[in-house]
């Protein structure tokens, strides 16, 4: 959520920034917010005048009573003033509700570093690691490799649940588990993140706090009876861990890593990478989340991105880092990098991680603040997160980049201790 004071003082700048985003945003709502804000402030002035008058009249009552004078008219005036104030309070509550409704639907403002552009084709490659994998045979897609090795079963998952679900079997299940353990060990032991094992369901307030709601409700799986939601990412519960709290400045940055299953309806993605493990309704992911002081956040974003890159380097998977343009930025981020791995069967790079700085956008929605010391005024933290990284897509990238002509798959060296010393799946 944006700072209302910022909108008030820089409305034209805010409108221009929102106009440059990819999704067509109706900037006239900024004028609507400003109109409501002005109305609210005018009413507050009137309320203060009425309260001052009521207090003045009220202070006269004891003196007049002591003098034996009739105070019925003054009491009646006080009652009228109180009723008038109460009426204004009702009006203010309605205005606040309207302002909140609009503010929750205004996207974040892109950081000046974000490049211009309208679609993902305008994203800018920052760096890459390893050349795309080449083969002297026609490489197979990971869903064919996994099916042939009997380690992935899409057909039976379709029978049991539906499309875009998967059974991992035998060494496939062990490979998935190995990747999860390797990622968690790397981020906790080498990168100094504190591990969190979060709930897989959250309430509506939590989804609003991180920006999934109200805009993306159609993409969420809702448990309707209790107004709970299956988490689309561990970012939601881990960020909301500190909702409505004031953190200590000397504790920042706070760094958490969380493994979780993730659940997404992927509304509107029909026909896009729907085969295999790339776009599933349920998938596993290791998430990195940081809470920082504002002046630290962009330095910490670079570190977080590097932490996510480390596991891809150690796995030996070719990847690149792209800076996301304004048109592809998404609702909540101020600046975002995507890590994309090379997928031979696609003959292109596929996103495996998004690393974002939300600045104070989520912190305002979730009311997460910090104080430098006991006497200091609370300030909003900056929140950051990134996949560290998506598990299913990592497994897909391993199967495709490490495949052999005979259909076997070499296990990356760093995973072999987690695979009982095995070197090959065949």
Swiss-Prot record:
PROSITE patterns: AA_TRNA_LIGASE_II. ATP binds at residues 264-266, 351-354. One of its GO terms (molecular function) is catalytic activity, acting on a protein. Pathway: Aminoacyl-tRNA biosynthesis; selenocysteinyl-tRNA(Sec) biosynthesis; L-seryl-tRNA(Sec) from L-serine and tRNA(Sec): step 1/1. GO terms for cellular component: cytoplasm. GO terms for biological process: selenocysteine biosynthetic process; seryl-tRNA aminoacylation. It comes from the Bacteria. InterPro entries: aa-tRNA-synt_IIb, aa-tRNA-synth_II, aa-tRNA-synth_II/BPL/LPL, Ser-tRNA-ligase_type_1, Ser-tRNA-synth_1_N, SerRS_1_N_sf, SerRS_core, tRNA-bd_arm. Keywords: Aminoacyl-tRNA synthetase, ATP-binding, Cytoplasm, Ligase, Nucleotide-binding, Protein biosynthesis. Its main location: cytoplasm. It is found in: Cytoplasm. SUPFAM superfamilies: Class II aaRS and biotin synthetases, tRNA-binding arm. It is an enzyme of class 6 (ligase). Pfam families: Seryl_tRNA_N, tRNA-synt_2b. The keyword tRNA-binding does not apply. L-serine binds at residues 233-235, 287, 387. Belongs to the class-II aminoacyl-tRNA synthetase family. Type-1 seryl-tRNA synthetase subfamily. Consists of two distinct domains, a catalytic core and a N-terminal extension that is involved in tRNA binding. Homodimer. The tRNA molecule binds across the dimer. This is Serine--tRNA ligase.
């Amino acid at each position: 959520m944006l700072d209302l004071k910022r909108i008030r003082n820089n409305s034209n700048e805010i409108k221009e920034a929102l106009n440059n985003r990819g999704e067509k945003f109706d900037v006239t709502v900024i004028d609507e917010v400003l109109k409501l804000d002005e109305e609210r402030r005018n009413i507050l002035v009137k309320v203060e005048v009425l309260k001052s008058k009521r207090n003045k009249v009220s202070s006269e009552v004891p003196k007049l009573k002591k003098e034996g004078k009739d105070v019925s008219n003054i009491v009646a005036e006080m009652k009228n003033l109180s009723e008038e104030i109460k009426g204004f309070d009702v009006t203010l509550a309605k205005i606040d509700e309207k302002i909140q409704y609009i503010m929750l639907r205004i996207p974040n403002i892109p950081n000046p570093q974000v490049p211009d552009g309208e679609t993902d084709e305008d994203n800018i490659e920052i760096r890459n690691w390893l050349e795309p994998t080449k083969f002297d045979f026609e490489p197979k897609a990971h869903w064919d490799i996994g099916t042939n090795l009997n380690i992935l079963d899409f057909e039976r998952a379709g029978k049991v649940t539906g499309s875009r679900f998967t059974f991992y079997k035998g060494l496939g299940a062990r490979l998935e588990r190995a990747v999860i353990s390797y990622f968690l060990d790397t981020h906790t032991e080498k990168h100094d993140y504190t591990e969190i094992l979060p709930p897989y369901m959250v309430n509506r307030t939590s989804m609003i706090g991180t920006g999934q709601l109200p805009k993306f409700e159609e993409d969420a799986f809702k448990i309707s009876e209790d107004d709970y939601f299956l988490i689309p990412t561990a970012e939601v519960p881990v960020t909301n861990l500190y909702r409505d709290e004031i953190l200590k400045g000397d504790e920042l940055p706070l760094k958490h890593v969380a493994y979780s299953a993730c659940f997404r309806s992927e509304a509107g993605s029909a026909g896009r990478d729907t085969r295999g493990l790339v776009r599933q309704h349920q998938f596993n992911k290791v998430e990195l989340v940081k809470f920082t002081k504002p002046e630290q956040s962009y330095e910490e974003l670079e570190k977080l991105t590097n932490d996510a890159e480390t596991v891809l380097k150690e796995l030996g998977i070719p990847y690149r880092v792209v800076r996301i343009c304004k048109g592809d930025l998404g609702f909540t981020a101020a600046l975002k990098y995507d890590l994309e791995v090379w997928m031979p069967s696609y003959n292109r790079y596929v996103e495996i991680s998004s690393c974002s700085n939300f600045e104070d956008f989520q912190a305002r929605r979730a009311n997460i603040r910090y104080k430098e010391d006991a006497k200091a005024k609370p300030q909003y933290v900056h929140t950051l997160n990134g996949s560290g990284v998506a598990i299913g897509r990592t497994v897909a990238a391993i199967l495709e980049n490490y495949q052999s002509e005979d259909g076997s798959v070499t296990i990356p060296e760093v995973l072999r201790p987690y695979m009982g010393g095995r070197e090959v799946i065949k």
